[in-house]
Amino acid sequence: NMERFRSRGKMDKLVYIIDLDGTVWEDTPNEIAHTHTKDAKLFDNAIEWINKKYDEGNYICLFTARTEALKKITEDKLNTIGLKYHQLMLNKPRLRHTEFKGYHYIDNCAVLKSSRFEGVWSDLVEKDLKITVFKDD
């Protein structure tokens, strides 16, 4: 998928890695996802925002803590709501019932951005924030 994407001259675009539960639609934990996914309420503008990024040529990767057992119901929901994406990745480590407070993503990519979703899909803006980086030797 990424090789085909690169060969189309998309190197100026971004890969958006987007969670589903609590981000695209209301939180439906794995324990209730079989019965609640179909009717899970979408966050306003989520579909429009993501589909716009897709249409602009960006790569959309959905990364969720849902398990392989929930793949079909998840894909059915995505098809029903018309969300455009390139890749669905399941089995993201779950934080819900652990002592961990968040994710820390490490990559060799020169451009790395992170946006905490707080319930509103709107334009992304730049802010000067303190970040954690590896110490230079």
Model-derived regions: residue spans:
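HAD-like aspartate-dependent phosphatase fold
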Residues: 3-137
